[in-house]
Amino acid sequence: MVSTHLTSTTLPDCYRSLIVNSELGSSALMDLNSPSFLYPLLHTPADKGTLCTYQAALGKVYASLEVIGVGDDKLQAVHGLNGGKPHRDILGSRITRPTGIKPLCLPRHILAYDWLAQSLLGIVIGSISLAYNELLMMEKLKGFRPFVPHIPFDFYLCEMAFPRVKPAPDETSFSEALLKRNQDLAPNSAEQQIEEVRQVGSYKKGTMTTGHNVADLVVILKILPTFLTMLTNETGFEISSSDATVKILITTVPPNLRKLDPELHLDIKVLQSALAAIRHARWFEENASQSTVKVLIRLLKDLRIRFPGFEPLTPWILDLLGHYAVMNNPTRQPLALNVAYRRCLQILAAGLFLPGSVGITDPCESGNFRVHTVMTLEQQDMVCYTAQTLVRILSHGGFRKILGQEGDASYLASEISTWDGVIVTPSEKAYEKPPEKKEGEEEEENTEEPPQGEEEESMETQE
């Protein structure tokens, strides 16, 4: 008959280990405290306190007993952690140092079956290994605080929880002002001089020959072509006239990025930026072709130009923000333009683009990259407090001033203003940039401590 017995032994620093006494033919004692048995699991003696705790191992044994069909009545007979009561909640991520743990003895009616005893022996040893791996992981993560982003308040995501006590205000004039501003910003047919860009020649036909690697592009204009100037830069070149500019960006296929020679080829960041622009255009065409989204983005670009606090917002961030404000709601139906415009300012004011916020994930990048992390902490704060001021002005009827229909309004974000007897005080910045270290201080620090890397300190948040 095969019998299995589990008991406890005392280790330095009050740690517990397991002794597995297996009578298989000849009696053999396997003490988990012995270096010969610990080496495959620990690679170090057990006296350093790295052995998995008795609590975690027993928790897995209890779970294993339940898996193989041992009922609650039989588990009551298993002496263990909670005065003989079965434990099912010891499999969590918390592993603590055990105190006052009783020995574990499997009941005789369980040990009456050879197959069950052998299974339990394997379960115990396997559980010890798993528990130890969990403990090692916890030791590595000790003191590490995982990043858990917060979700800023968005009224339109929880509108049902805040029922109105008054009828919705009439915003017809606000909607008309938005449409009027969009009409002023949209280029007319005369300004849109490019009709089409076509690939032609042997490249388009697929009849190119060796030694004549030339691709022909034809730009069809709506106007009479005049003499143009060409300006080369690090990203490609620009063809411009007094009224319009065409930018030509150069890149390569993604597999070639690993083969670039810095002394021979273009900067990899330039090539990656052009590839990203292609992904952005493709995503926008597939997901943001709704007319309200396009109008809102045009208005946001105008807002960025007229208010310095919004300058850090890149065109791609504005694209995603406009799409989010119009389409991301419980009904999955596009919101009205006036509602979406107000929502943009509200969620920016609530901290959508602050360091701890969930923000907006870039749909064209891998790894859950939050688009606002391209901004510095100072810029993120500036966007937030500028939006807070404009939200208060908008709430008191100052939309014409915000839209630029009543002259320059850039001062509103930094000066006190009055709207229908209500005084609006601009929000103040919450982030203070750390003082820059002097050259002498940096040299002293370098002499005291050896450098640990070549990376410069950056204010950009990292994922």
UniProtKB/Swiss-Prot annotation:
Modified residues (Phosphoserine): 173, 189
Domain of life: Eukaryota
Annotated localization: Nucleus, Nucleolus; Cytoplasm; Nucleus
Region (Disordered) residue spans: 424-463
Bias (Acidic residues) ranges: 441-463
PROSITE patterns, A to Z: DZF
Residue numbers of Phosphothreonine PTMs: 461
Biased composition (Basic and acidic residues): 429-440
Keywords noted in UniProt: Activator, Cytoplasm, DNA-binding, Isopeptide bond, Methylation, Nucleus, Phosphoprotein, Transcription, Transcription regulation, Ubl conjugation
Statement: the UniProt record of this protein carries the keyword ATP-binding: no
Oligomer and partners: Forms heterodimers with ILF3. ILF2-ILF3 heterodimers may also bind to PRKDC/XRCC7: this may stabilize the interaction of PRKDC/XRCC7 and the heterodimeric complex of G22P1/KU70 and XRCC5/KU80. Forms a complex with ILF3, YLPM1, KHDRBS1, RBMX, NCOA5 and PPP1CA. Identified in a IGF2BP1-dependent mRNP granule complex containing untranslated mRNAs. Interacts with IGF2BP1. Interacts with CRBN; this interaction promotes ubiquitination and subsequent degradation of ILF2.
Function: Chromatin-interacting protein that forms a stable heterodimer with interleukin enhancer-binding factor 3/ILF3 and plays a role in several biological processes including transcription, innate immunity or cell growth. Essential for the efficient reshuttling of ILF3 (isoform 1 and isoform 2) into the nucleus. Together with ILF3, forms an RNA-binding complex that is required for mitotic progression and cytokinesis by regulating the expression of a cluster of mitotic genes. Mechanistically, competes with STAU1/STAU2-mediated mRNA decay.
Protein name: Interleukin enhancer-binding factor 2
